[in-house]
Amino acid sequence: LPTDGVTVNVAPGTYRLTETFQLEQQDSGTSDCPIIYRCDPKQRAWIDGGNTIALSDFAPLTNPDIISRLPEVARSHVRCIDLSELGIAYVKELPDSFNCYGSRQDALAQLQIYYAGKPLYEARWPNHGFSHFNDVLELGDHPRVQDGRGGAFTFTPDPERLKRWAGAEDLILHGYFRRDYYSHSARVAKVDLERSAITLAKGLIDEAHHSRRFYAHHLPEELDLPGEWYLHRKNGLLCLWPPEGSASDHVMLSRLDGPLVRID
């Protein structure tokens, strides 16, 4: 390297990545001869790991199974597009327990959708914030225990909601089941209508944990607001209630199944 180091000037523009941009030790130089990566401060260089899809490419939803699961208020608004036909990769089956923290090597790269630079959210309940469960019925086993039991708890929303959840194809809860500093998602194995109880497919619930916050997501039964979406993972059909307004004519879908940038 030159004695005064090297500067890599990134030209302005958008750089669409199909894999993680990785920098390792040899890419940094030394403290005396550093390698500096930068763009012109008066211009912008974007690193992009997404696919852009025009809202006009979404078609009316015609799948009778999905339509029957949507709230009536959403049925005339929801439009869809086939990700498989577009060649966009996605996780076809969610595990029984997972998280999406990028700091973890085993983090699940979930599909993310953005509109006008802001994230849109999977159909969920409640639409904002968290609900809370009541009594812990079964502690369950730690997620690392192979073939471990899932925890169970009572939950008393309105009876019709719990009845809809009992018939859901794929019910996922995200919550702080063990600690207030750690949340994760867990598949529901069983909804007991008689006891108003939910049993997780996997995962430990701490009986002494007082917060007990969670929300349900990945549910077409709860798609009831503009900007919410649902992905039918078996056939790749992305269902979206388009956002209100005219801030953008397209949405962007995350493409990578790993970090956008990794520095080792």
What is each stretch, according to the model?
Residues L1-D264:
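Extracellular polysaccharide-degrading/modifying enzymes targeting complex plant/algal/animal polysaccharides
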